[in-house]
């Protein structure tokens, strides 16, 4: 396994070559990876449909309501929670500027005033996780907004592991399997989270049958998963 110094050396060389092509977006992604390696961050990213419960799951992990439970109406709507010694919130704007905020309500106010917020970085002191541990909450993969899709893909490539999160009623959507297949091709470890399993009705279909259908679909698409979680409220069934 390469050391951080070796990784940074390769990344800087790659960045230098990419800069020759004037591909600003790819350079930006490489810069994000460089930052992650330099700061020795372990990053877990939640992606999935709108209203799949990604923010709620992140709040559950921290045991605090850090993120609003409904989507933040920002242009790219990505929230980055990093464990640090001190708390703070930074809004990153599309013009490469940023501003420090006192609370998340100010993000909503900025959007009402038509500020173009690309992402929100939250520094949070947590006794549960080591400093540098980062959780990212991305826009819905089913969004038709180009900047939402761009934001999701950008943070996808800076992740150590990706939690693909879906609502119980939308498990069999082809979009899910197409996206997870892409993650496999990018060599990003994937955990499949089927949320709101409390919607399951045992009188309509047994849980074992539902589970078998999920596993069969994954096999048909030839998708490799690190794990599957069936989540309902604060308890989980795991595979």
What are these regions (language model features)?
Residues 22-23, 206:
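Alpha-helix capping and helix-coil boundary motifs
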Residues 30, 35-239:
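Globular "head" domains of long coiled-coil molecular machines
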Residues 1-21:
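Charged, amphipathic alpha-helical linker segments immediately N-terminal to NTP-binding catalytic cores
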């Amino acid at each position: 396994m390469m050391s951080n110094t070796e990784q940074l050396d390769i990344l800087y060389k790659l960045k230098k070559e990419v800069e020759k092509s004037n591909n600003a977006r790819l350079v930006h992604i490489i810069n994000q990876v460089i930052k992650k390696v330099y700061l020795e961050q372990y990053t877990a990213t939640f992606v999935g449909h709108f209203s799949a419960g990604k923010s709620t799951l992140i709040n559950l992990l921290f045991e605090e309501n850090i993120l609003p439970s409904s989507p933040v109406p920002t242009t790219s709507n990505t929230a980055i929670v990093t464990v640090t010694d001190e708390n703070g919130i930074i809004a990153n704007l599309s013009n490469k500027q940023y501003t420090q905020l006192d609370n998340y309500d100010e993000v909503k106010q900025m959007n009402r005033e038509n500020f173009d917020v690309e992402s929100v970085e939250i520094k949070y002191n947590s006794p549960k996780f080591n400093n540098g541990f980062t959780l990212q909450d991305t826009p819905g993969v089913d969004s038709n907004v180009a900047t939402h899709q761009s934001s999701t893909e950008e943070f996808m490539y800076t992740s150590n592991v990706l939690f693909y999160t879906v609502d119980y009623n939308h498990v069999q959507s082809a979009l899910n399997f197409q996206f997870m297949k892409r993650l496999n091709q990018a060599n990003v470890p994937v955990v499949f989270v089927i949320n709101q399993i409390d919607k399951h009705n045992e009188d309509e279909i047994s849980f074992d049958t539902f589970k078998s259908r999920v596993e069969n679909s994954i096999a048909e698409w030839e998708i490799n998963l690190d794990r599957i979680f069936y989540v309902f409220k604060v308890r989980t069934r795991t595979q």
